[in-house]
């Protein structure tokens, strides 16, 4: 890339789901050149491709061989299953995946240059996020590619870190507790409130204050209520049944 800016790189996205959609749009807005989007679903591939002014395909064998960087953002099982087909004929490019739970060595034996570009955030197609505050964790098998991935991530975010596969696995697990399990608690709360004719909106100030607290306090110090003692004594019988079940 000597003499050229990183924005001149030709990038292909393998996947057009929640993360891929947000990441591709963010890169496009920063001037990066997205040349193609692949998805098994035509609607998803076409919609994202139109947004970032790229070509699209729903056939793996039609994925361009001309891109310099391939960003794979698929469900874990699909990625592992399709990996040999995905890289076929394109082994000399730089390949990265965006998964928190998949180690970098998944690429070994398939491509020479490889790494990970992991933005740790929850993504939805319908909701755009501020990438400036999203932590990116990068890893690469070659130091020059680590620097390149850091430069790409730094074009989007102020928070860019190197992390090993082992570290990233722990990050991902912590993120599951912080986000996915927390949201599942909201689902249980919403079901309980609905059963008794109460609006979930009543919980929003509580949710917001709980989140704000941990910006200033350690999570343990911020904990209040029966959970401090892991006690269900002061929780009503209907709620106890929900928690226990």
Predicted features and spans:
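NAD(P)+-binding Rossmann beta1-loop-alpha1 motif at the extreme N-terminus of oxidoreductases
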Residues: 2-56
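NAD(P)-dependent Rossmann-like dehydrogenase/reductase catalytic/cofactor-binding core
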Residues: 5, 10, 201-236
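Internal alpha-helical scaffold of NAD(P)-dependent oxidoreductase catalytic cores
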Residues: 9, 44, 48-51, 128-215
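Short phosphate-binding/catalytic loops that engage adenosine nucleotides
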Residues: 32-33, 112, 158, 198
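Rossmann-like NAD(P)(H) cofactor-binding subdomain of soluble oxidoreductases
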Residues: 42, 52-128
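Single conserved hydrophobic/aromatic residue that forms the stacking wall/gate
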Residues: 234-245
